[in-house]
């Protein structure tokens, strides 16, 4: 399930990164030919936000965020699993608060409108925060379960 979630989230990130790229391209071309298209900047900014947040959550699952891993590289077995459990618990707590406060941001800004496209609500942008938080929490809890299996000798290191 976690791998399917990651693939979906990665695909979503790629879609938003593609929208970002296309919006920037449209902006460059229209400026070159002297036509003013005002919505491209907002579309580029907001699609980039979604792409970054989806990618950040995937990086939690893949453990690709910047970290000081000297100690985790030196430890083996149950000691390493214990340390990784603590680290993932901290990430899970952080993800919980991102979800909680992200939800508050969504409810606060839901009815605000985009400047260039007033038909669209800002809530669609802000919802990326709790989506990222929930998926980070799922990934962290999945890691914790794996570490607990190692600690209980149910899985090899």
Task: Explain the meaning of each model-derived region.
Residues 1-157:
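Alpha-helical transmembrane segments and membrane-interface helix-loop junctions
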